[in-house]
């Protein structure tokens, strides 16, 4: 299992508010933890955080997990003091109704509740309709616009006000698991690599803006700067073991079944083979996801950076993605970190990533 110190760090990371474009709070938490063992820790102008082990080693391996989460942003404050918000990233507005929200105001946190017309007052036809973002507002308890603007301004971001919780069977529930769990796992893999390093220079990256940037956001910037020969992207994928999930379309990736190794059009076959071989050698359970086109992750951008990067995608099964309460297995997280650390030890200057 993950040590208590790592679990404590993970919960601090998950509880930190940091929607896309506003990731500075979780980024600081990540960098503070990285400084406890990494050789070099730094940030960049795009908000990315980087931690490095074996800086004189070769080749360079990039481990990427995006640290941003979906959120909300204040677009308008009306005369009655209600804030009207838009999405940062992809929300199902249905899950927002009645939630408590934590807005990052100019002088600190501002808490509110997301309101909607009560069902008692709706016409019959409206009761059957799905909520739209425009149907919702945020009530911060202000009496009027002037009072609200003392605490909030247009452009202030926010997240759902919830905290990480332990669940039975070594499961963890939190908002921001997509993909702060990937940023955590990248650093946890680096920590394990640091205890028994191989020949490679390994850089863990907590990248920004994945939820809003189709071009790869902060991950593309890091890939251009680091010029890695190999990259492993760590993200989440849909767990297949909750009601309504179609395994014929998604594959079979249950909570607790281990890391999910993607195989497909954008994935370097050499790196995929390294991952599968290492998992079999270490007796780490895993499943395979087939991707016939793009993956909708940072892997899509990283693999075409500079002259091209040998890229793989390792995912952690996640229930209830893009909701206030996502769920993962801590066993899957630990196995993913252990697998990635082992693969990094297997790579050296003679490793040929050319697909043959």
Language-model features: locations:
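N-terminal hydrophobic/helix-forming segments and targeting peptides
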Residues: 1-356
């Amino acid at each position: 299992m993950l040590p208590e110190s790592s679990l404590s760090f993970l919960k601090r990371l998950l509880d930190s508010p940091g929607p896309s474009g506003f990731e500075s709070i979780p980024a600081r938490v990540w960098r503070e933890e990285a400084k406890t063992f990494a050789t070099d820790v730094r940030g960049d102008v795009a908000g990315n955080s980087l931690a490095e082990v074996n800086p004189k080693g070769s080749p360079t391996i990039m481990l990427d997990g995006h640290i941003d989460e979906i959120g909300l942003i204040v677009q308008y404050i009306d005369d009655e003091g209600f804030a009207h918000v838009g999405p940062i990233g992809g929300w199902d507005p249905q899950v927002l109704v009645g939630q408590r929200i934590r807005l990052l105001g100019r002088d600190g946190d501002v808490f509110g509740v997301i309101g909607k017309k009560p069902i008692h007052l709706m016409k019959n036809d409206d009761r059957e309709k799905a909520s739209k973002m425009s149907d919702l507002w945020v009530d911060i308890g202000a009496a009027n616009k002037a009072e609200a603007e003392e605490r909030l301004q247009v452009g202030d971001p926010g997240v759902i006000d919830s905290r990480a919780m332990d669940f039975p069977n070594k499961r963890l529930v939190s908002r921001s698991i997509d993909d702060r769990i990937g940023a955590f796992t990248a650093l946890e893999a680096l920590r394990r690599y640091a205890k028994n390093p191989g020949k490679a220079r390994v850089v863990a990256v907590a990248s920004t803006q994945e939820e809003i940037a189709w071009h790869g956001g902060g991950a593309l910037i890091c890939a251009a700067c680091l010029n890695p020969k190999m990259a492993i992207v760590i993200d989440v994928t849909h767990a297949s073991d909750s009601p309504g999930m179609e395994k014929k379309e998604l594959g079979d990736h249950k909570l607790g079944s281990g890391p999910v190794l993607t195989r497909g059009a954008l994935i370097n076959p050499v790196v995929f083979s390294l991952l599968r071989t290492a998992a079999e050698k270490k007796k780490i359970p895993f499943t395979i996801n087939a991707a016939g086109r793009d993956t909708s992750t940072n892997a899509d951008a990283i693999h075409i950076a500079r002259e091209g990067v040998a890229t793989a995608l390792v995912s952690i099964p996640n229930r209830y993605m893009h909701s206030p309460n996502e769920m993962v297995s801590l066993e899957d997280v630990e196995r993913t970190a252990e697998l990635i650390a082992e693969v990094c030890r297997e790579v050296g200057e003679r490793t040929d990533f050319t697909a043959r």
